[in-house]
Design a protein with these regions (language model features):
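Short, small/polar residue-rich loop motifs at catalytic or cofactor-binding pockets
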Residues: 279, 406-409, 474-476
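Extended C-terminal subregions enriched in glycine
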Residues: 469-471, 504, 513-561
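Active-site rim segments in enzyme catalytic domains, especially the processed small/beta chain
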Residues: 82-89, 93-108, 265-268, 420-485, ...
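C-terminal motif of bacterial Sec signal peptides marking the signal peptidase cleavage site
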Residues: 18-19
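Noncatalytic scaffold domains of N-terminal-nucleophile
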Residues: 26-57, 69-240, 245-247, 252-299, ...
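Bacterial N-terminal signal peptides that target proteins for export
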Residues: 1-9
Length: 594
């Protein structure tokens, strides 16, 4: 039995209509289908939550065939790479957090891209040591790191897969050959990004223009069918042997595209061959009776853990929960404190010492929380000194890094019939990555997540500076929460660039602190407090909340909308699963009964 929540109307009349079941059709001018939380009828059931209906359908089908959560994740990502190319793909990378319901172990699979061996620390600077600008950096070969997604999924499958690896690509291959339907969101991003798509070889390669625009140079239309046979061929190769992605013709194609002018990159075949995905122990924060777990650096998940940890020691939330402006000011202050430390300390900890234990130490968080006043916001927030709580000293004095990582990302959650959970965030960095295509895939521009400068204005080294073989700092923060008995309680995560940290923390606060349902937590207004300003969704936040933030002393920017794409699953006390999917995107939830 299945229950697919809200099928957007642009699927009506199309070849996969039978996958969509809903009590009513939904359509809005913003192409953002709404959805409601779903509760399962039995604890043994599974759930899939993704940002795209076709990907959700694929994941659910794999679960019904006896696949694990990791098996489903492989099929989901193969489809998302095709139908949501603005967000993620096999030309990019990501992080997977996995909960094993037998061992109760939480592990992390790190598929973050790496910088080439011959990378230059000043590659994004001009002859005057000034930045060449984000768009020039993005639409270049300089911006592409070694893609890690295929290696990460292969490693996870070796440990947790139940079905043969090659079976998981069938849906994506069929869609690539026969055509997928261009969704409103894909069309919207082509429209928005259109002016940056290189249309002259002096600006960059013409890959994106040829794929995303029609013969008249206009964005491909909503509802039109788009084939991608190069991608189908790539998938066949990966399905046969994932290692061929890094050693064979696909690798050669990737290197050739990266090394094209203008602004050619240094990525080599040796860089491709040398790439390794990593299996790591999850980084966990104790918050009350719970364990909140996510990826260690180069992910910035430590800031998510710190936000929830700080709230243990700030003045208590009032019983009015999300309705009380004071509660939002407390959450904003926790964000500011956590972002300040993240911007200062976090980078690939294979290259830089990161005081992770100190940043999550309860005594340190208690000390930092004393900076929070119930009366008035501090004009500015400086990073703290977690090294005192790390039982070691800093190797270097580090400079502040406010580098943005732009919102071209996706997140999904899968719970299989045995209770194993995947929380996975994937990205090509900015929208359509570098705009260069190899093997039918958009190649990432993840190296723009590094600081363009090696030092700050005071001459201090920046932790997230460019170095050969290094993984750039990421905001991707897939999260799994365990209850007091070590059982799965919640999985969450989001796209959204630097705002991912705040978006993800919002759902944790909503469910764990304010006792909201998964969907209610997703629907809360997104608020991001990084630095000295607060940004909040004006159409979702009440006037009282916005005014309360101003009264507290913040400079508040009311945003027309935020680029989150939250996918959430919560296990209720009776063992049932409850899902939440972001109405700001096109995602759906599918329940799988076994």
């Amino acid at each position: 039995m299945k229950n697919l929540i809200k099928c957007p109307v642009w699927f009506l009349g199309l070849l996969w209509l039978s996958a969509c079941t809903s009590s009513q059709d939904h359509h809005s001018n913003s192409a953002q289908p709404s959805s409601n939380s779903v509760e399962l009828k039995q604890a043994a059931a599974g759930m899939v939550v993704t940002a795209n209906p076709v990907a959700t359908k694929t994941g659910a089908a794999i679960l019904r065939a006896g696949g694990s959560s990791v098996d489903a994740a492989i099929g989901i990502q193969a489809v998302l790479s095709l139908v949501e190319p603005q967000s993620s793909g096999f030309g990019g990378g990501g992080y997977m957090v996995h909960f094993d319901n037998t061992t109760k172990q939480v592990d992390v699979y790190d598929g973050r891209e790496t910088a080439p061996k011959n990378v230059s620390a000043d590659m994004f600077l001009d002859q005057d040591d000034q930045s060449i600008g984000f768009i020039k950096a993005k639409t270049s070969g300089l911006s592409t790191g070694v893609p890690g997604m295929v290696a990460m999924l292969s490693l996870a499958h070796a440990n947790h897969g139940k079905l043969p690896w090659g079976e998981h690509f069938a849906d994506a291959i069929k869609l690539a050959n026969e055509g997928f339907v261009v969704s409103p969101r894909l069309h919207m991003w082509i429209e928005r990004f259109g002016k940056y798509i290189p249309r002259d070889l002096k600006e960059g390669t013409l890959d994106a223009a040829n794929y995303l625009l029609d013969a008249n140079g206009e964005s491909i239309a909503v509802g039109s069918l788009r084939t991608n046979r190069d991608y189908a061929n790539t998938l066949r190769t990966i399905a046969n042997n994932p290692r061929d992605f890094y050693t064979g013709d696909i690798a050669k194609d990737i290197v050739q595209q990266v090394q094209q002018t203008p602004r050619a990159g240094s990525l080599s075949l040796q860089d491709m061959r040398d790439y390794q995905a990593l299996k790591k122990s999850a980084l966990c924060a104790s918050v009350g009776d719970l364990q909140l777990c996510g990826p260690p650096p180069s992910s910035s998940w430590v800031a998510v853990g710190a936000m929830l940890g700080l709230l243990e020691f700030t003045p208590e939330f009032s019983s009015r929960a999300d309705k009380d402006p004071k509660n939002w000011t407390l959450f904003a202050e926790a964000q500011r404190l956590a972002y300040a430390d993240r911007d200062h300390y976090v980078a690939d900890n294979e290259f830089v010492d990161v005081p992770l234990l100190g940043m999550l130490n309860k005594d340190y968080l208690r000390e930092r929380a004393t900076l929070v006043s119930v009366q008035r916001a501090k004009p500015s927030i400086a990073p703290g000194d977690p090294w005192e709580y790390q039982n070691s000293t800093a190797a270097d004095t580090l400079g502040k890094d406010m580098t943005d990582d732009v919102a071209g990302t996706t997140h999904f959650v899968v719970v299989d019939g045995e209770g194993n959970v995947v929380s996975l965030t994937a990205s090509v960095e900015s929208v359509f990555g570098s705009t260069r295509i190899a093997g039918g895939m958009f190649l990432n521009n993840q190296l723009t997540d590094f600081s363009f400068q090696e030092t700050d204005d005071q001459g201090n080294k920046i932790a997230n500076r460019i170095e050969a073989g290094k993984r750039p700092r990421s905001s991707m923060s897939p999260t799994i929460v365990l209850d007091q008995d070590g059982e799965f309680l919640m999985a969450t995560g989001s796209p959204g660039g630097n705002s991912i940290i705040a978006y993800t923390a919002k759902t944790l606060v909503g469910v764990l602190n304010w006792k909201l349902s998964a969907q209610e937590a997703v629907n809360l207004p997104n608020m991001v407090a990084r630095g000295d300003k607060v940004r909040i969704e004006k159409d979702r936040a009440s006037p009282a909340i916005i005014q309360g933030l101003r009264d507290y002393g913040y400079t508040v920017k009311e945003s027309a909308g935020e680029n989150s794409g939250l996918s959430v699953v919560v296990r209720l006390p009776n063992g049932q699963l409850q899902g939440g999917v972001d109405p700001r995107r096109e995602g759906v939830i599918e329940v799988v009964d076994f």
